[in-house]
Every structure is written in structure tokens, then in C-alpha cells.
UniProtKB/Swiss-Prot annotation:
It catalyses: L-glutamate 5-semialdehyde + phosphate + NADP(+) = L-glutamyl 5-phosphate + NADPH + H(+). InterPro entries: Ald_DH/histidinol_DH, Ald_DH_C, Ald_DH_N, Aldehyde_DH_dom, G-glutamylP_reductase_CS, Glu-5-SA_DH, GPR_dom. GO terms for molecular function: glutamate-5-semialdehyde dehydrogenase activity; NADP binding. NCBIfam families: PRK00197.1, proA. Its EC number is 1.2.1.41. Pathway: Amino-acid biosynthesis; L-proline biosynthesis; L-glutamate 5-semialdehyde from L-glutamate: step 2/2. This is Gamma-glutamyl phosphate reductase. One of its GO terms (biological process) is L-proline biosynthetic process. One of its GO terms (cellular component) is cytoplasm.
Length: 429
């Protein structure tokens, strides 16, 4: 088994260690803010190459994490998020390549105007600074967050879950070597070298001004803790209670395909559908939709109308409408048209991702305009709630708040702006 780093079991020096990491990251952020796009892209090219070359090393490290997690009795959905395969490592490398192709936003003048006194004002994109990313079981987050922050000129401090510690360390080694090949500082992408949970609290404190933004990736308990305790801004979503509404004007075959994909493509991702809403005007669609789900191995929990259509449907409780299962389970309910669907989502949704399936353009427009979620879709699966699918290369998370970033947080969303003003000696009267 890979030898643990010194702080893995806790250390009286942990506050000093974390403050030192933040200090080094801040220094690296100053370098990255001025690094040309070509230099950052050289680092990304090297990272992609190293990830591909070391797939066996990464999977071996991950296998140790998986063995330990199984012994701890983790759930099947958690195990799916933790496990790396050759295909998933290849996808990680593909994501790095995609980020490399994204235009560098830093230094871009997004708007420019001249005032009556002759001054020219420019609004220019700049990095946020140092970003702290706290995540749980998904080791691929280490790569996604690392390269997105690099491309956007930010330094990042990664604090992965103890379950994925070895996997993240193997991935991080590739990222750091890529930085070195491009002549960029190691501290541009820092992995907290400990499983000590106290490190999370220290990171949330902002480390004496060393961290500018926190991004949590994990379950609702982690996200709730981050939002409650963080002393710096947070980009986060609490959970993904996502809905697919099948309207009376929906094509049945399209609806079956979308519902099946939205729920069962990957049940453990935040874009998975958790509730199926069916228009009362199309109750003939209930049975085939339920058949499609149950035949794919999904448990369906429904209201009386859904249960009347299929005896295999289990009764839904009030809690089911508010549950993010992250498993092969879905709640199903009959509603009174698009108005009923919107009302249900307003009462039980999490402002993440919701979809309507319909051929009625007016119903689709009403749904898209009135559902207050970061991502709303017409005739498409909720599993497209992903930065890569948006053309962002990858994502550091899905933000469901309304300040600064909303939806998939990619390279551009990890920037802010400043104003540059050019004068010719103007003074204010």
C-alpha cells in the first residue's frame, strides 16, 4: 500500500501547514495571472499526456481506495463515483484536451467605451485568485478543477475526500509534473496532503485571506456545511432534485428515451432525474413510461394515479418528492398540465436542472421561462447538465445560486473583471 503523507493521521502543525499552502498558492496565483495562454496550454498538454501514460498507476492507486471503501460498507452509488476505469481515465485526459482548446479569457476586453471627457474605460477579465475546492468521492474532480483553474489563471487548493486520497494523489502528481514542464509553479495546483477532516474547517476559514472562493463538490451534508461555515464566497448547489415533465403533447417514444436516459444513464450524477411528472391529459403514457423504467432496473415510487397504471409501482411518501436518490429510484406523479408541473417544481425542486418533453412550443416556452432553475431543457435529457456538454471543456461544479456564477462553472465563470481607464490628464471638477 502506498505510504501516507505525514499529516494523514492529524498533526498539531495542521494550521501552519494549511496557511503555508495558502501562502504558496497566493504567490503562484500572481504568476498565473500574468502567464500567457501558450504557457498554460503547454502545461495542459503535458498533463493530458502524463494522465494517459500513467493510467495503470492511477487505476492501481484507485483500486486501493476502492478496497478500503468496500470494507467500510459504502453504497453502490458512492462506489460508482469513486471507481476509475481505463475509459474514465481516458475521459479525464480528453477533458484536459478540451479545456486546452477553450479560449483563454484572461485579459479579454469585454466592453469598452469613451466618456464625454475623453477618458476610455475598458472592462477586462481577470482571475479570481485562489480557489479552494472541497470534494468527496470523485477523483476526477482533482483533474477537472486543477485544469480549469489553471486555464482561468487561478491557483487552486484541492481537498479531496479521504476515500479517494490515493487516487487524487496519483492524478495530482501528473498535474504538478505538467506545471513543471511548462515552467509554472508547483503551488498553482495544490493537493492538501492529509485526510485530517480539520483541514476542511481551516480551508473554510479562508486561511487569513489566502483563499478567495470555495467550491464544494459532494453530498448535501458537505455542501450545507460549507455554506454554513465558509468565511469566503461559495459556488455551490445543495442537491440535484431534478424533474422531467412529460406534457400531453409529448411524443411517447421521445419521452421514453429521454426519461430513461435522464434517470438511468448514470444514477449517481447530480444531473440525474429524480422525479417524473406526467400530464393528467396523457395518462395513457404512464404505463409505457413506467415499463421502460422498471425494465431497466429502476424502482418507481408513485402517487395513486401512477400506481393505478402499474401494480409494480411502490407508494410514494411526501419525502420522496424532496429526495435526491442518486440511485436507481425515481418518484412519479401525475400533474395538471404545465402549470401543475411548474407548481410542483417550485415546491420541491432544488433550482438545479429540470426538463419538459413536449411538441407544444407555447408549453415549452412557459416551462423554460417560469421554472427557476440554473438549467432548463426542452426535449433533452437532464444528464446534459455538464460543463463538457455545454462546450466549456469541463466544469468545476454546477452553481445553483444567482450571484456571479450559475449553472456549469467552467473557465469563463472562474473569472471576474476589473476596469482599466485611460486618460490624458483629466481631473474631476
Amino acid at each position: 500500500m502506498t505510504a501516507p503523507l505525514k499529516a494523514i493521521d492529524g498533526s498539531a502543525d495542521l494550521p501552519a501547514l494549511m496557511n503555508d499552502l495558502a501562502s504558496r498558492a497566493r504567490a503562484a496565483a500572481r504568476v498565473l495571472a500574468l502567464a500567457p495562454a501558450a504557457q498554460k496550454n503547454r502545461a495542459l498538454e503535458a498533463m493530458e499526456r502524463l494522465i494517459r501514460a500513467r493510467v495503470d498507476t492511477i487505476i492501481a492507486a484507485n483500486a486501493e481506495d476502492v478496497v478500503e471503501a468496500k470494507a467500510a460498507g459504502i453504497t453502490s452509488s458512492f462506489l460508482d463515483r469513486l471507481t476509475l476505469t481505463p475509459a474514465r481515465v481516458a475521459a479525464m485526459a480528453d477533458g484536459i484536451a478540451a479545456v486546452r482548446e477553450v479560449a483563454d479569457p484572461i485579459g479579454i476586453v469585454t466592453e469598452s467605451w469613451q466618456r464625454p471627457n475623453g477618458m476610455t474605460i475598458e472592462r477586462v477579465r481577470v482571475p479570481l485568485g485562489v480557489i479552494g475546492v472541497i470534494f468527496e468521492s470523485r477523483p476526477n474532480v482533482a483533474a477537472d478543477a486543477g485544469v480549469l483553474c489553471l486555464k482561468s489563471g487561478n491557483a487552486v487548493i484541492l481537498r479531496g475526500g479521504s476515500d479517494s486520497f490515493r487516487s487524487c494523489r496519483a492524478i495530482h502528481e501528473c498535474l504538478v509534473e505538467g506545471l513543471r514542464e511548462a515552467g509554472l509553479p508547483d503551488a498553482a495546483i495544490t493537493l492538501v496532503p492529509t485526510r485530517d477532516r480539520a483541514a476542511v474547517g481551516l480551508l473554510l476559514s479562508g486561511l487569513n485571506g489566502g483563499v478567495d472562493v470555495i467550491v464544494p463538490r459532494g453530498g448535501k451534508n458537505l455542501v450545507a456545511r460549507v455554506e454554513a461555515e465558509a468565511r469566503v464566497p461559495v459556488f455551490a448547489h445543495l442537491e440535484g432534485v431534478n424533474h422531467v415533465y412529460v406534457d400531453g403533447a409529448a411524443d411517447l417514444e421521445m419521452a421514453k428515451s429521454i426519461v430513461l436516459n435522464a434517470k438511468m444513464r448514470r444514477t449517481g450524477v447530480c444531473g440525474a432525474a429524480e422525479t417524473l411528472l406526467i400530464d393528467r391529459a396523457s395518462q395513457d403514457k404512464i404505463k409505457p413510461l413506467v415499463d421502460t423504467l422498471i425494465n431497466a432496473g429502476c424502482e418507481v415510487r408513485g402517487d395513486d394515479a401512477v400506481r393505478a397504471a402499474d401494480a409494480r409501482v411502490k407508494p410514494a411518501s411526501n419525502e420522496d418528492w424532496d429526495t435526491e436518490y442518486l440511485d436507481a429510484v425515481i418518484a412519479a406523479k401525475v400533474v395538471d398540465g404545465v402549470e401543475g408541473a411548474i407548481a410542483h417544481i417550485q415546491a420541491h425542486g432544488s433550482h438545479h436542472t429540470d426538463a419538459i418533453v413536449t411538441a407544444d412550443v407555447a408549453a415549452a416556452d412557459k416551462f423554460l421561462n417560469e421554472v427557476d432553475s440554473a438549467i432548463v431543457l426542452h426535449n433533452a435529457s437532464t444528464q446534459f447538465a455538464d460543463g463538457g456538454e455545454f462546450g466549456f471543456g469541463a466544469e468545476i461544479g454546477i452553481a445553483t445560486g444567482k450571484f456571479h456564477a450559475r449553472g456549469p462553472v467552467g473557465v469563463e465563470q472562474l473569472t471576474s473583471f476589473k476596469y482599466r481607464i485611460h486618460g490624458t490628464g483629466q481631473t474631476r471638477p
